[in-house]
């Protein structure tokens, strides 16, 4: 006769005549990944126990035993001595079971006025809040590295691109400051997300609250939350905080990927705009000459995992009725993986930018290619010859075609050639056709003129110092 599984190890087993099938245990268990929440779980449980004692719901001696026992559990986990069990499903039941082994009967009082629903919502929210802080710190370091690059090359001229074709001259500093702005918005998004998630679900119990006279304000304060969540159903159903974290991570990931792509292109022999540090490059097993931008390529690839995690959790959450459904167990792996990859990508990009050498001579040599000052010529025709911009655009296009056919650049056209297209052109036009004059003229707010770039660098330095003060 086949032996039936039992519910002996299950804290919810009282209502069941038989235990779960092995396949059920396998699909139900989350301890393989949610053990990462151990510190948050223990922190939440200690706050809950202290509150229960303060409210006279459990004795002070039981609360003290629970608090000390949980510290023992924490120590065992951090030393690698903790006996994690798949049969106990998750981090919450593993911790409580071990606590019972350590302190006995008082451990059974810990779960008074609490459900795993508000427990996991609290643990996970605490963990994601910590990850917002980590992302903010990582982005701060990355912004500083990009600012350093911008400061070095505030007046280094380089080609600006649209469609990966030469468009207009810009400066290296201006290009780097574009990423500072992007990463700055990312940092703000994580700060905003952190503010919204900084409310405590603890005390919502399963979904309806509890009849015990608990003090949710006290546990919220103890855990560093601003306030308890106002609706118990929402408190256990909500995963907006995880979705907001993933959304912020996904947008940041796109910015990292765009910069990684540019570094891969720019480091190629065909561009030679930048030289990667040996510390963030690898070689080939067969081609001795190779120096591959693997760190940038791996950042670009890992970004796909972050984007995938965001989509996956949105899909999990989109069809769930209130309140808790077991589907929500699938929230954590997505966030864990996205966080791991985001923090690695931020650190790698910061290291790459810190060590990166921009090749000024190559940048400046390329800046004038592709008739990059054609727009300056058209603007000159508007200002000096009084042409409507569309007519100036047409005349400039004709001059570009003339230069292209002759195999020369715009500044190499003779005045006679230029006047054959428009007689109003004078020798003064040559003053706007140089790349340095072109960038210096872009003095509009946010423009590429070195003075504007330096002003933006100073603004960002001040902004960062204000935030860190």
From Swiss-Prot:
SUPFAM superfamilies per record: L-aspartase-like
EC number(s) stated in the UniProt entry for this protein: 4.3.2.1
Catalytic activity: 2-(N(omega)-L-arginino)succinate = fumarate + L-arginine
Gene Ontology molecular function terms on file: argininosuccinate lyase activity
Pathway: Amino-acid biosynthesis; L-arginine biosynthesis; L-arginine from L-ornithine and carbamoyl phosphate: step 3/3
A cellular component annotation (GO) from this entry: cytosol
Keyword Cytoplasm: yes
Top-level taxon in the UniProt lineage: Bacteria
UniProt KW tRNA-binding keyword: no
UniProt keyword list: Amino-acid biosynthesis, Arginine biosynthesis, Cytoplasm, Lyase
Subcellular localization(s) per the UniProt record: Cytoplasm
Gene3D superfamilies: Fumarase/aspartase (C-terminal domain), Fumarase/aspartase (Central domain), Fumarase/aspartase (N-terminal domain)
Leading EC class: lyase
Stored Pfam families: ASL_C2 (PF14698), Lyase_1 (PF00206)
Main localization of the protein described in the UniProt heading: cytoplasm
A GO BP annotation: L-arginine biosynthetic process
InterPro entries, per database record: Arg_succ_lyase_C (IPR029419), Argininosuccinate_lyase (IPR009049), Fumarase/histidase_N (IPR024083), Fumarate_lyase_CS (IPR020557), Fumarate_lyase_fam (IPR000362), Fumarate_lyase_N (IPR022761), L-Aspartase-like (IPR008948)
Protein family membership: Belongs to the lyase 1 family. Argininosuccinate lyase subfamily.
HAMAP family: Arg_succ_lyase (MF_00006)
Record's protein name: Argininosuccinate lyase
């Amino acid at each position: 006769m086949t032996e039936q599984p039992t519910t002996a190890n299950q804290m919810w087993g009282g209502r069941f005549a038989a235990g779960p099938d092995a396949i059920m245990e396998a699909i139900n268990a989350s301890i393989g990944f949610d053990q990462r929440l151990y510190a948050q779980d223990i922190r939440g449980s200690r706050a809950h126990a202290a509150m229960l004692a303060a409210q006279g719901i459990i004795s002070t001696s039981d609360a003290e035993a629970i608090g000390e026992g949980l510290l023992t559990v924490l120590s065992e986990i951090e030393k690698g001595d903790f006996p994690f069990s798949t049969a106990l499903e998750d981090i919450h039941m593993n911790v409580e079971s071990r606590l019972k082994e350590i302190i006995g009967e008082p451990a059974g009082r810990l779960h008074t006025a609490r459900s795993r629903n508000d427990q996991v919502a609290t643990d996970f929210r605490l963990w994601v809040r910590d990850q917002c802080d980590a992302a903010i710190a990582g982005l701060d370091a990355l912004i500083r590295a990009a600012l350093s690059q911008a400061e070095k090359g505030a007046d280094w001229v380089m080609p600006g691109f649209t469609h990966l074709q030469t468009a207009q001259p810009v400066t290296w500093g201006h290009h780097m400051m574009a990423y500072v702005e992007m990463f700055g918005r990312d940092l703000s998004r994580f700060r905003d997300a952190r503010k919204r998630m900084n409310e405590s679900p603890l005390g919502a119990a399963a979904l309806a609250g509890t009849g015990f006279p608990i003090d949710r304000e006290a546990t919220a304060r103890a855990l560093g939350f601003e306030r308890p969540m106002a609706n118990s159903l929402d408190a256990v159903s909500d995963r907006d905080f995880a979705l907001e974290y993933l959304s912020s991570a996904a947008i940041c990931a796109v910015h990292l990927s765009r910069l990684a792509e540019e570094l891969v292109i720019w480091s190629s022999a065909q561009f030679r705009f930048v030289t990667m540090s040996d510390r963030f490059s690898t070689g080939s097993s067969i081609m001795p000459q190779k120096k591959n931008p693997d760190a940038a390529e791996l950042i670009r690839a890992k970004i796909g995992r972050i984007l995938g995690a965001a989509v996956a959790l949105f899909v999990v959450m989109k069809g769930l009725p209130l309140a808790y459904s077991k589907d929500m167990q699938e929230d954590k792996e997505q966030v864990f993986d996205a966080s791991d990859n985001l923090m690695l990508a931020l650190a790698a990009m910061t290291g790459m930018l810190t060590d990166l050498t921009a090749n000024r001579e190559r940048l400046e040599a390329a800046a004038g290619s592709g008739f990059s000052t054609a727009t300056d010529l058209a603007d000159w025709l508007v200002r000096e010859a009084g042409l409507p911009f569309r007519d100036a655009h047409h005349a400039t296009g004709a001059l570009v075609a003339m230069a292209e056919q002759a195999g020369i650049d715009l500044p190499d056209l003779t005045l006679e050639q230029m006047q054959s297209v428009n007689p109003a052109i004078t020798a003064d036009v040559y003053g706007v056709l140089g790349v340095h004059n072109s960038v210096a003229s872009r003095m509009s707010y946010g423009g590429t003129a070195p003075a504007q770039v330096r002003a933006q660098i100073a603004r960002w330095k001040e902004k960062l110092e204000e935030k860190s003060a």
